[in-house]
């Protein structure tokens, strides 16, 4: 397999948090690649350590300059097999890896995928909502006013909507979403999850107003937010979470 991928950039999906979800092909590529490019030093080091792989690697993240991206692109096309991983899930989706992909393609290099977990797909699949059509919005603006405008625009077609947010901003975003839904007179159901695949995973399905009642009690975590299609409603509230947070005993698993 390595010979067949000489000179290629392979985007390798890693787990969303549970290392048990890593595929055998991903392990093989991580172990035998000539060049490895990660997103953050600590996360990539932890991944390699969990696999008992000792390997040096380069970084491509939000701090990587355009000049450094060009340099990495040249390294890829001049090397053997290069693997790109992100901190979680599939690289190239809402992370700086997409810039490297574009650079490699501009230089005539090959880009291939070793697919696996992806957070928005996992959340959408367990939401219970209709999945066709859906709109993936990535991360919204940091500014509340701009964010509300974005939410209004994404919700207008009536599709199922999926977006990411940071652990530090998701509570403000959910409150903005509530304001937009009230302003537009829509009563759409949501699916909200934190820390997918981990023991601390938290899920909520139902009306956003019900989630807001307990929002301040929720911990920091990596969220995915799914809004149902316009005609799809859920009147029944449903919470679920892992066993390691006894303070949430009232939430049903």
From Swiss-Prot:
The keyword Protein transport appears for this protein: no
Top-level class of the enzyme under EC nomenclature: transferase
rRNA processing keyword on record: yes
EC identifiers of the protein: 2.1.1.198
InterPro entries: 4pyrrol_Mease, 4pyrrol_Methylase_sf, 4pyrrole_Mease_sub1, 4pyrrole_Mease_sub2, rRNA_ssu_MeTfrase_I
Catalytic activity: cytidine(1402) in 16S rRNA + S-adenosyl-L-methionine = 2'-O-methylcytidine(1402) in 16S rRNA + S-adenosyl-L-homocysteine + H(+)
Protein name: Ribosomal RNA small subunit methyltransferase I
Organism: Leptospira borgpetersenii serovar Hardjo-bovis (strain L550)
């Amino acid at each position: 397999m390595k010979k067949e991928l000489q000179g290629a950039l392979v985007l390798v999906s890693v787990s969303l948090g549970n290392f048990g979800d890593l595929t055998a092909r991903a392990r093989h590529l991580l172990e035998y690649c000539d060049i490895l490019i990660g997103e953050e030093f600590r996360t990539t080091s932890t991944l390699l350590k969990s696999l008992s792989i000792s390997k040096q690697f380069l970084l491509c993240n939000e701090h990587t300059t355009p000049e450094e991206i060009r340099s990495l692109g040249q390294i890829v096309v001049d090397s053997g097999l290069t693997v790109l991983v992100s901190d979680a899930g599939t690289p190239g989706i809402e992370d700086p890896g997409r810039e490297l992909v574009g650079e490699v393609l501009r230089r005539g290099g090959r880009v291939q995928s070793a697919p696996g977990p992806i957070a928005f797909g996992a959340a959408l699949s367990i939401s219970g909502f209709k999945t066709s059509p859906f709109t993936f919005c990535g991360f919204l603006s940091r500014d509340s006013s701009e964010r509300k405008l974005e939410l209004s625009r994404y919700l207008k077609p009536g599709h199922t909507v999926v977006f990411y947010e940071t652990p530090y901003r998701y509570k403000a975003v959910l409150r903005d979403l509530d304001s937009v839904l009230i302003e537009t007179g829509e009563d759409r159901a949501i699916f909200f999850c934190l820390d997918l695949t981990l023991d601390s995973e938290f899920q909520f399905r139902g009306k956003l107003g019900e989630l807001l009642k307990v929002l301040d009690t929720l911990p920091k975590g990596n969220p995915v937010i799914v809004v149902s299609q316009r005609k799809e409603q859920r009147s029944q509230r449903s919470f679920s979470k892992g066993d390691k947070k006894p303070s949430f005993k009232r939430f049903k698993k």
